Amino acid sequence: MSMNSNVYVAKLGKTVGLQGHLRLFIDSDFPEQFKKGVTFTTNRNLQLKVLEYNSSRELVKFENYEDVELAKKLTNQELYATIEQTKENCKLAKNEFFWFDLISCEVFENNLKLGTVKEIHRYPLNDYLEIITDSELVKKALPKNFLIPHIFDKFILNIDIENKRIDVINSFDILENS
């Protein structure tokens, strides 16, 4: 399975104690996906099944790695979940979307295509959509890419995942001034 069909969710740190627990550095908005019985794939293509997860101590233990020496071999590995697994285990609230669903959406303001979402960037106050500007606008000497704050009502009006379309406001001004 290619890493492109998987979603990066966490990194494993050092072992803690003698029974195979590892520090878990979660890089996901959904810590609830780390529950007993769930399987993740590592960047070394290992399949790891969660045996225990302690959210308050941020520790995880995997099946067949219940020994500190075995668990040490997992240090610094990245954990990935499949897109299907992510959708099944992570429940979204209103106006919440998976980043992988936003990537490649076309962005429109008043039916003018501004571009396509390339990436999402996390900053302390807000997330930002990185937009690759539509080629017709680049021909008019506008920047090749720009960032739109992921803030509903102020910049984002509507996100239609099924049609891969995001309608925005106040974003053409950002493009012009980028």
Curated annotation (Swiss-Prot):
GO terms for molecular function: ribosome binding. GO terms for biological process: ribosomal small subunit biogenesis; rRNA processing. Its main location: cytoplasm. InterPro entries: PRC_barrel-like_sf (IPR011033), PRC_RimM (IPR056792), RimM (IPR011961), RimM_N (IPR002676), RimM_N_sf (IPR036976), Transl_B-barrel_sf (IPR009000). Residues 94-174 form the PRC barrel domain. Keywords: Chaperone, Cytoplasm, Ribosome biogenesis, rRNA processing. Belongs to the RimM family. Binds ribosomal protein uS19. This is Ribosome maturation factor RimM. It comes from Aliarcobacter butzleri (strain RM4018) (Arcobacter butzleri).
